[in-house]
Amino acid sequence: MIDGRSKDNSLKIIKKYSNKISYWLSEKDDGLYDAFNKGMKLAQGQYIGIINSDDVYTANAFDIIHKYITKNPKADFIFGSVKKHWGILYGYKPKKIKFSWGFYSSHSTGFYIKKDAAKKVGLYNIKYKYHADYDYFYRMIVKKKLKGIATKKNEVVGIFRRGGFSSTIPYRKMFIEELKIRYDNGQNILFLLILGIYKILNYWKKKIIK
């Protein structure tokens, strides 16, 4: 468990359950993805999974993931379905990652990767403060060509709860970083221009409807 010297009750809760935690660390970090990297470096098992402090696993999450690991030993990673406030985020269509309008397949809460495969991809790029997970997925799928699978839509392994880190980020900052990540990974400039216009129009459409 990695804590960035939280100012809430996180450390108190960690200490309360320390006998049930194999390892915990509380020190200043350089943002969410720096904490992810620390956890990945310390991970001892064959698979790595990450969950943010505001999110939760479903009661049968690990049974579902274990089933897919057992049936698909050659898969490098698994995208598990994640419940969000608007519906369920699910599926895996690798060809769509380059040109998808929105962000990609799973949330970090539903993502599991073999430790050996994670070493091939490297760490999360902490220069990206909001969407380093998309950059990670892009490198993993397009550049390293790792093989993955997804659980069925109704096999939900995690719940993304509003009010966490990503819920407090201004849309403009998220939008700019999304385009930067796509550009840095060599995506088509014409497509990025079209995507930018689409995102802006969609943003103002939602504003007007509200």
Q: What are the language-model segments listed below?
A:
Residues 56, 60-91:
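Conserved donor NDP-sugar-binding/catalytic core segment of glycosyltransferases
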Residues 9-10, 36, 57-64, 74, ...:
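Acidic donor-diphosphate engagement hotspot in glycosyltransferases and nucleotidyltransferases
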Residues 10-13, 26-43:
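Glycine-rich, basic loop-to-helix element that forms the pyrophosphate-binding segment
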Residues 1-5, 25-26:
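Short beta-strand/loop segment that forms part of the nucleotide-sugar
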Residues 48:
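Short aromatic/hydrophobic "clamp" motif used to bind/position activated sugar donors
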Residues 32, 51, 56-61, 84, ...:
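Hydrophobic/aromatic residue at the end of a short beta strand that borders the catalytic acidic motif
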Residues 3-12, 52-55:
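A conserved acidic beta->alpha catalytic loop
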Residues 91-177:
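Conserved nucleotide-sugar donor-binding catalytic segment
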